[in-house]
Design a protein with these regions (language model features):
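Small/polar beta-strand repeat architecture
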Residues: 146-176, 180-227
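Surface-exposed, low-hydrophobicity beta-strand/loop segments enriched in small/polar/acidic residues
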Residues: 1-145, 155, 195, 222-247
Length: 247
């Protein structure tokens, strides 16, 4: 019997770079477990004289990503009959590779990435992370490229901003957009649409908490793809016999 396929989050063997494997402790503020193939932010572990690696949490945006978690040497992951995938909860240690480690890490891929394998696309094709569907995608597919849209209201509750438009915006969850001109300025920036409750509303997480509802409305515009592109390449694509994680 012969089987060929990747497993999400299990880095491929590489004797030259395997010593770049890092370990950290999942942040106490993390409310969802981590697993292999998740982008993470790396935080300074306080001033302890004997820290057990960095503090790790799920990345909230492109600028936040330091690397990707892996299952390699992470033997403490929790499994249950309902969840055979090893999970790493708050306070547990987890393995990860930083960008620049030159490790090959299988990640869940979007249809846009899989399509690259059928048209001889360059390995340098710009890639972005889909924070809603937890998968790698192309920057061209992830970034909004439509006409400018004006907001009619923006509010902030529980760490999430809700924007309202006067007409149907056509946005989908996972799409990157640029918001500009809003006051407070904390509402502005390149952000990810996290949900679309109605045709005229959507939610996103600002980089910092605004002081209140928007007193001056903003404009939703196209993103600069360089602002959402990851420092990563597609080395190979496998479709049909690989294992990915669903949560």
């Amino acid at each position: 019997v012969q089987s060929d396929g990747f497993i999400q989050g299990v880095a491929l063997d590489d004797p030259a770079n395997r010593f770049n494997l890092a370990s950290g402790t999942v942040s106490a503020t993390e409310t969802k477990p981590l697993w292999g193939g998740v982008p993470v932010a790396e935080l300074i572990p306080g001033v302890s004289s004997s820290p057990r690696g960095s503090t790790i949490r799920r990345a909230l945006g492109v600028a936040d990503i330091e690397g990707f978690t892996v299952f390699n040497q992470a033997h403490n992951g929790l499994t249950t009959p309902q969840s055979p995938v090893p999970l790493f909860a708050s306070g547990m240690s987890v393995s990860f590779y930083r960008f620049g480690a030159n490790m090959r890490i299988p990640l869940k891929a979007s249809p846009a990435v899989i399509a690259l394998g059928t048209n001889n696309a360059s390995v340098k094709t710009a890639l972005a992370w889909d924070f809603v569907n937890n998968q790698i995608t192309t920057a061209a597919d992830a970034g909004y490229a439509g006409a400018d849209i004006a907001t009619t209201a923006i509010s902030f509750t529980g760490g999430v901003a809700t924007a309202t438009t006067g007409a149907a915006h056509g946005l989908t969850a996972g799409k990157y957009i640029t918001i500009s001109g809003a006051v407070p300025a904390a509402y502005n920036g390149t952000v990810v649409v996290t949900s679309v409750p109605t045709a005229t509303t959507f939610t996103y997480v600002p980089a910092s908490a605004p002081s209140g509802a928007a007193t001056t409305q903003g404009t939703i515009g196209a993103v600069t793809l360089a602002n959402i592109t990851l420092p990563a390449k597609v080395i190979s694509i496998q479709s049909g016999n690989s294992k990915t994680v669903s949560y």
